[in-house]
Amino acid sequence: MTLPRPVAAVVFDMDGLLFDTEKLYGQAILTAAGELGVEMTTEVFLRFIGTPWAHNRRQMLEAYGEAYPAEELRVAWMRHFKLLVVDNLDLKPGVEALLDLLDELGLPCAIATSSSHSTVEHHLGEHGLADRFHHVVAAGDYANSKPAPDPFLVAAQKLGVDPRDCLALEDSLNGVRSASSAGMMIVMVPDLIQPPDEIRSLCATVASSLLDVPALITSSRRGSAAASS
């Protein structure tokens, strides 16, 4: 596994990449649907990963009809999610070691997410990570959500780094599409969805966890140093 260029900055997705929250969203929406007595399946939920509410609402109406109580479900869904997060907000393996490496190498990093700033602040605060990221790009900071390139382009702009020299770390299909459209190098770390060939072709590599990423970064920089010496 190698990266095509030396890494100058890293842009992280959040849900399913930094935090093991996608499974909590899945549990919460099924519980909420049961509470309201409406249909919802894991198959339909998986279409929501890495996408904003407007997209999710459309998916619900397409799957279950225009009379589906999407807004009511959203309220119950978020209520159950917040209850689950209280005792189950787990970091993904390798997060802290990777952030330590970036500090050691002096590489800036940012988060690019479809979640709200308040959600990001809560999750980072729960694990003492609020000061580990130079910038947070969240809902409201860009015109178009993933799979459009906007979140990653805004992150690169805030970091002051050419997008081509940024490494994007993503777990979702739309996240990979977004980072690819922004011109970034991509390592996908799949969570609930395995990448089809179309998505694999957009990635420098697909890793089993964030534990694999430090070696990729150090190797890319070592190769650059050797080439310039």
Which role fits each region the language model picked out?
Residues 15, 49, 93, 109, ...:
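Short glycine-rich loop/turn motifs that provide flexible caps or phosphate-binding loops at active sites
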Residues 48, 112-114, 169:
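Structural motif
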Residues 3-105:
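N-terminal helical cap/lid subdomain that shapes the substrate entry/recognition surface
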Residues 16-17, 44, 85-86, 111, ...:
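Short, contiguous strand/loop micro-motifs
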